[in-house]
Amino acid sequence: MSYTIQAQTRTEIGKGSSRRLRHAGKVPAVIYGAGKEPVSIVFDHKDIINIQTNEDFYTSVVTIVLDGKEVGVRAQAMQRHAFKPMIEHVDFVYA
């Protein structure tokens, strides 16, 4: 099964901006690896909350549409809220 997430590049970095994004229903994330520069991104929480329940999300290549370009990535790490059904941050690596 293939998964696609629409994302935008983040311009503001830091704890305060990440909190504002989460409060607005967004998930901050980063894409790194393969000798490339890390890219900070943000996407809607609703885009990932349902697809992350499937086991193959963690092993298959996920397509992120980042500012009009498609990027193939794999989920490396995911931080979740302690008791709310909420994802706080995702680390992706280039596939």
UniProtKB/Swiss-Prot annotation:
This is one of the proteins that binds to the 5S RNA in the ribosome where it forms part of the central protuberance. GO terms for biological process: translation. Keywords: Ribonucleoprotein, Ribosomal protein, RNA-binding, rRNA-binding. Pfam families: Ribosomal_L25p. CDD domains: Ribosomal_L25_TL5_CTC. Part of the 50S ribosomal subunit; part of the 5S rRNA/L5/L18/L25 subcomplex. Contacts the 5S rRNA. Binds to the 5S rRNA independently of L5 and L18. GO terms for molecular function: 5S rRNA binding; structural constituent of ribosome. One of its GO terms (cellular component) is cytosolic large ribosomal subunit. This is Large ribosomal subunit protein bL25. Belongs to the bacterial ribosomal protein bL25 family. It comes from the Bacteria.
